[in-house]
């Protein structure tokens, strides 16, 4: 088998129900979600699978939730292939919080530590903009001059 690269997602790719089929059908995935719940002393899995979208979108929940789903997929792949992730993966990368997931995927961080770090990171990011209205817009296909005019 050729070695491959994995890029783990950042915040914004979350959706209620993500990972539920993994949880229901693979013991290794269930073990990941259970470990995250235990580390955070919270039933985050319930929020991930059945929760309110606004609750999942809270940065303090989103970050460990996305890590949990990604690591659950890693553990299922390891189990199905009968190989450690590092045996069939050449490189791991992550976008934003995905960097933590990539470290966890190669056992540089354990699931419990990654969960706790991402909760702290999520809380810090959430609190940094608590009383500030923020927005983000993606601009695709416009010339730089037009964008600069719009920003003035």
Regions found by a protein language model. Give the residues of each.
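Alpha/beta catalytic cores of group-transfer enzymes, especially the acyltransferase/condensing modules
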Residues: 11-14, 40, 84, 105-152
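Helix-rich "cap/lid" substructures immediately adjacent to catalytic or cofactor-binding pockets
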Residues: 2-93, 142
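Short, glycine/charge-rich beta-strand/loop segments that flank catalytic centers
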Residues: 53-54, 90-93, 97, 122, ...
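Hydrophobic side chains within alpha-helical segments
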Residues: 66, 73, 102-104, 124
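Glycine-rich nucleophile elbow surrounding the catalytic serine of serine-hydrolase chemistry
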Residues: 95-104, 108
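Short, charged low-complexity intrinsically disordered segments located at boundaries
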Residues: 61-67, 100, 146-152
